[in-house]
């Protein structure tokens, strides 16, 4: 039975919301969940960047911000050093938690080789992982997760399925956790 879950979908459709709903229920059931997610930073109703949130420790640090130095993705400069911290968070979660969430594996996050390596190791580990991946990226690690790995169940988040999708993912992850 596949132990990895991959979510895709257009920006703003609710992929992070689905992940966080799954996390909340798993924790209510007594499971530990670690990893990262990358919410927007808004100022005056306008998106000005993104941060990284460590789900285990609760730490927050910048992923990207308008006008920042560092590798560029659109109008944002990416903080590669912080992605290396995110990679460490993922590695820690693989070793210490029941389920790992990596939201997102997208153009900004892929600027760090350490992050890419951590994603690969998380996918290869025996710990179930939920990955949010960029829908159109051709990066090898994204293509592998989105299209090629046999140990992945894939879902595309849409307006019509996003409300019940967390239940389907939970059912899959809980079944896997109970079988191991």
Swiss-Prot record:
Q: Which GO terms describe its molecular function?
A: ATP binding; ATP hydrolysis activity
UniProt key word Transit peptide: no
Which reaction(s) does the protein catalyse, per the Swiss-Prot or TrEMBL entry? a ribonucleoside 5'-triphosphate + H2O = a ribonucleoside 5'-diphosphate + phosphate + H(+)
Q: Where does ATP bind?
A: 9-16, 99-106
Q: Give one Pfam family.
A: NTPase_1
Name the Gene3D superfamilies for this protein. Answer: P-loop containing nucleotide triphosphate hydrolases
First-level EC class = hydrolase
Q: Which CDD domains match?
A: RecA-like_Thep1
Enzyme Commission no:
3.6.1.15
Q: Which UniProt keywords apply?
A: ATP-binding, Hydrolase, Nucleotide-binding
Functional description taken from the UniProt entry: Has nucleotide phosphatase activity towards ATP, GTP, CTP, TTP and UTP. May hydrolyze nucleoside diphosphates with lower efficiency.
The Swiss-Prot or TrEMBL record describes its family as follows: Belongs to the THEP1 NTPase family.
Identification of the protein by name? Nucleoside-triphosphatase THEP1
Native source species: Methanopyrus kandleri (strain AV19 / DSM 6324 / JCM 9639 / NBRC 100938)
């Amino acid at each position: 039975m596949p132990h990895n879950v991959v979510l895709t979908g257009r920006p703003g459709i609710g992929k992070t919301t689905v992940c966080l709903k799954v996390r909340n229920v798993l924790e209510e059931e007594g499971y530990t969940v670690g990893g990262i997610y990358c919410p927007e930073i808004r100022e005056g109703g306008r998106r000005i960047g993104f941060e990284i949130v460590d789900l285990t420790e609760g730490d927050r640090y910048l992923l990207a911000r308008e006008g920042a130095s560092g590798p560029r993705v659109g109008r944002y400069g990416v903080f590669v050093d912080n992605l290396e911290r995110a990679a460490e968070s993922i590695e820690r979660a693989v070793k210490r938690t029941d389920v790992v969430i990596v939201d997102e594996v997208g153009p900004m996050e892929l600027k760090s080789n350490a992050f890419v390596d951590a994603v690969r190791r998380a996918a290869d580990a025996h710990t179930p992982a939920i990955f949010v991946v960029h829908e159109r990226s051709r990066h090898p690690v994204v293509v592998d997760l989105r299209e090629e790995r046999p140990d992945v169940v894939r879902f595309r988040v849409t307006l019509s399925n996003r409300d019940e999708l967390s239940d389907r993912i939970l059912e899959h992850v809980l079944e896997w956790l109970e079988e191991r």
